[in-house]
Structure formats: C-alpha cells, structure tokens
C-alpha cells in the first residue's frame, strides 16, 4: 500500500467522522432545544401555581413551612442512618475476624512442639494484635458516627411532632401546595440535569468535529508539501536528461 493510499484512507475516515459528528450535533441540539422548552414551560407553571395562591392559604403555608422543610430532609437523614449502621456492622465483623486470627495463631503456637516455636509466632501474633487494635479503633469511630446519625433522626422526629402539635390544621391544608411544589421542583431539577448532559454531548461532538477538521488540514498540507517537493525535483531531472 502506497503513501497515497494511506492518505486516501485517512481522508475517508475523517470525512466519515465529520458526517457522524454533524449528525450527532444536530440530533443532540434538537433534543436540547426540546428540553429547554419543556423547562421553560415547567418554570412558568411553577411561578403561576406557586405565586397565585389565596391570602388565606398563604397564611397556612407560612405556618407549616418549617414542618415541610424538615420533612424534605427526613429521607436523606434516614439514608445516612442506614449507611452508618451498615458501616458499623462491617467494622464489627472486621474486629471479630481479626480476633479470630489471633486465637488461631495462639492455638497453633500451643500445638507446636518445636523449641523455637514461640520465636516464630511472637512477631506474627504482635502484628495481628496491632490489626485488632486498628479494627477496634475503626469500629469505635463507626459506632460513634452511627449514634450521631441516630440522634439527628430522633431530633428531626421530635421537631416534626412538635410542628404537628402546634400547626396540625395549617399543615393539613397546605400539604397539597407543598406536594405540588416538590413535584415541580423535582421535574425542573431533572430537566436541568438532562440539559447539562445534552450540552456536554453537543460539546464533545463539536470537539470531535474540530479534531477531524484539523486532521484533514494536516493531510492536505502534507499532500501539498509532497507535490511541491516533486515539482521542485522535476526541472533538475529534465536537465540531467538533456545533458546526457
């Protein structure tokens, strides 16, 4: 395969990349415009529904705001409690395993009849005891973390109960407002996230397009240089032929 053939293959490859990148850019930009339009529509709906509320309901909304703010944190706090509990259980298991290894080493030492057996085992046992100490330290930290997360949850539950006792009627009347607000907010956040993803995809395809254009320019420059070199050699070759 000649150098010209390699260049032709490279050109075809880069042209194909350009076409693919162009198609992808158009596709992702269309999707992006659609999501932007949907976001604007949701935002208008949010403003219309959240701002256009009767004064009487606005009072209930104001009284119950603390309850729903706390309620919005509840699932995250419960998740943290579950994670801390799982980590504590893992650390307890690590401690148990480390202690079992120490016991196994002690049993092996007791069953070994060799005179220098203690010398062989003492370093290993000491190392394993250090591992037990480290595991116990990590377990203690995990236990404290779990206890702290549980306290956070208990405090939250107490605050929620207090809010219900003080503003139960207002909370009941304003619940549809806050539930609708949560739905619209979640929808807008999802749309914003999708917009960010699509913008990233568009930029990646544009970068790919630019890379292919630069590659084609380099191939073009290379071909031009080769032709220029061949042209400069041609007169000298003709002169040599005439002199002979």
Curated annotation (Swiss-Prot):
Record keyword Cytoplasm present: no
Cellular component terms per the entry's GO annotation: cytoplasm; Golgi membrane; Golgi trans cisterna membrane
Keywords for the protein's UniProt record, in alphabetical order: Cell cycle, Cell division, Coiled coil, Golgi apparatus, GTP-binding, Membrane, Nucleotide-binding
Lineage top rank: taxon: Eukaryota
Segments for region (Disordered): 221-244
Broad class of the protein's primary localization: cytoplasm
Chain segments annotated as transmembrane: none
Pfam families, A to Z: SH3BP5
Low complexity bias (residue ranges): 228-238
Tissue: Expressed in germ cells.
Annotated localization: Cytoplasmic granule; Golgi apparatus membrane
Signal peptide region: none
Coiled-coil ranges from the UniProt annotation: 6-39, 81-144
Consequence of gene disruption: Viable. Disrupted localization of rab-11.1 and prolonged cytokinesis in embryos. Double knockout with rei-2 results in a smaller brood size, weak embryonic lethality, enhanced mislocalization of rab-11.1 and prolonged cytokinesis in embryos.
Disulphide connectivity of cysteines: none
GO BP terms: cell division; intracellular signal transduction; protein localization to Golgi membrane
Role: Guanine nucleotide exchange factor for Rab GTPase Rab-11.1. Spatially and temporally regulates the distribution of Rab-11.1 to target membranes during embryogenesis. Plays a role in cytokinesis, probably by targeting rab-11.1 to the cleavage furrows.
Family recorded in the similarity comment: Belongs to the SH3BP5 family.
Assembly with partners or alone: Homodimer, tetramer and multimer. Interacts with rab-11.1. Binds preferentially to the GDP-bound form of rab-11.1.
Protein's name in the database: Guanine nucleotide exchange factor rei-1
Source organism of this protein record: Caenorhabditis elegans
